[in-house]
């Protein structure tokens, strides 16, 4: 189902619309989108230097709401929304959720955290706009989540992908037959994840189809891009609202379509805090190949994760998603892991902590298998510690995948 005609605009018309909105929002006079590459970037440091409200284009008193990032690497990124921004965000979330398969009347179990985090509110607003009732459970209390999923019969689960695994385990621990749940869709975002984890989620919650969502608080929160339920091969970017580029992470030079690089976004309609050429730190590629679903928008592919989470070990770039992909190729490895980085002399050393799927698994054998597949996938030797089931920390929000002990 198509929510907005903008999802099927011919590419040439879309570029004209983007150029018009770019000029209107930023007062730029450029003849083509190719001129964008000559303009400066904004980044996390830009926002930190302007903390908390230095980049607002309207007085604080004219805002309708304020959200903020988690501030994992320092002070949080504060984002303001005018009433028009909230309306835009709601429409974008309705568009995303519709392309992901949500229909009017479907009961949505929202296990994303509410508060400063945008995830809970964004999905709530989008569902209500579609006409899908919401159970605003928020995060935490996995046993209660399992009970409510069973008793209320929700058809849609919203959470981070790592928390979906926690909920699936809670369903089993509560003695509930996962096959008795009425779940049809899982809408997951807030952290990078792989097709391997998608498979683990769908096995833990049978009948559910897992769909990937992408967003960041600096843009609006969730609602920037999402997979279509028909294909699930790349996240459709809402290009009438966000202009996306791929640049070289080191030089900032534009890269051709299909090359892997850093995602850069420009907001085209935001009022409170428009951002020009914002460097996300997220590594992926872009394709404008037509999608079988009928949408013409560009798609994000191969989203590895943030450069902040990348670890360089003996000259090799290692992302948590690389580790996840390798581990989940092993049937005895559970979808819970952490990457621990430590300094040994002048070298960085990597240890992957993981768990077996059950206490009956031979941990020595799993360790050997894990070290082998990690060496094959990463090209370097990595130490693996197999911990007892339930030892790797769980999270109700974004999973902590990298533990840096070098300082």
What are these regions (language model features)?
Residues 1-68, 73-91, 95-99, 103, ...:
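Nucleotide 5′-phosphate-binding alpha/beta core
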Residues 137, 213, 247, 342, ...:
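Conserved beta-strand termini and adjacent loop/short-helix elements that scaffold enzyme active sites
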Residues 157, 264, 269-378, 397:
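AMP-binding/adenylate-forming catalytic core of the ANL superfamily
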């Amino acid at each position: 189902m198509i929510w907005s005609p903008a999802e099927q605009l011919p590419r040439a018309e879309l570029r004209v619309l983007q150029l018009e909105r770019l000029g209107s929002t930023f007062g730029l006079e450029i003849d083509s989108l190719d001129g964008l590459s000559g303009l400066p970037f904004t980044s996390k440091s830009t926002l930190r230097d302007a903390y908390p409200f230095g980049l607002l284009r309207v007085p604080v008193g004219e805002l309708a709401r304020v959200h903020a990032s988690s501030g994992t690497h320092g002070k949080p990124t504060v984002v303001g929304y005018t009433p028009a921004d909230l309306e835009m965000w709601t429409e974008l979330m309705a568009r995303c959720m519709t392309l992901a398969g949500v229909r009017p009347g479907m009961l949505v179990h929202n296990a994303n955290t509410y508060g400063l985090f945008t995830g809970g509110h964004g999905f709530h607003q989008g569902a209500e706009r579609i006409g899908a009732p919401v159970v605003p459970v928020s995060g935490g209390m996995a046993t209660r989540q399992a009970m409510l999923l069973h008793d209320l019969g929700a058809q849609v689960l919203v959470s981070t992908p790592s928390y979906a695994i926690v909920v699936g385990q809670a369903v089993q621990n509560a003695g509930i037959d996962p096959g008795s749940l009425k779940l049809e869709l899982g809408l997951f975002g807030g952290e990078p994840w792989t097709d391997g984890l998608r498979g683990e989620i769908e096995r833990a919650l049978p009948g559910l189809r897992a769909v990937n969502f992408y967003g960041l608080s600096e843009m609006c929160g969730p609602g920037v891009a999402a997979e279509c339920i028909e294909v699930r091969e790349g996240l459709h970017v809402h290009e009438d609202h966000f202009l996306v580029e791929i640049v070289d992470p080191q030089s900032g030079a534009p890269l051709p379509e299909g090359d892997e690089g850093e995602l850069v976004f420009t907001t085209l309609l935001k009022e409170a805090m428009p951002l020009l050429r914002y460097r996300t730190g997220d590594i992926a590629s872009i394709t404008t190949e037509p999608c079988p679903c009928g949408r013409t928008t560009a798609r994000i592919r191969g989203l590895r994760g943030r450069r902040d989470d990348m670890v360089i070990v003996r000259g090799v770039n290692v992302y948590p998603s690389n580790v996840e992909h390798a581990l989940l190729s092993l049937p005895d490895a559970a979808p819970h892991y952490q990457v621990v980085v430590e300094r040994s002399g002048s070298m960085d050393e990597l240890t992957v902590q993981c768990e077996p799927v059950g206490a009956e698994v031979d941990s020595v054998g799993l360790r050997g298998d894990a070290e082998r597949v990690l060496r094959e996938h990463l090209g370097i030797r990595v130490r693996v510690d197999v911990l007892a089931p339930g030892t790797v920390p769980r999270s109700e929000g974004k999973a902590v995948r990298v533990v840096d002990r070098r300082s």
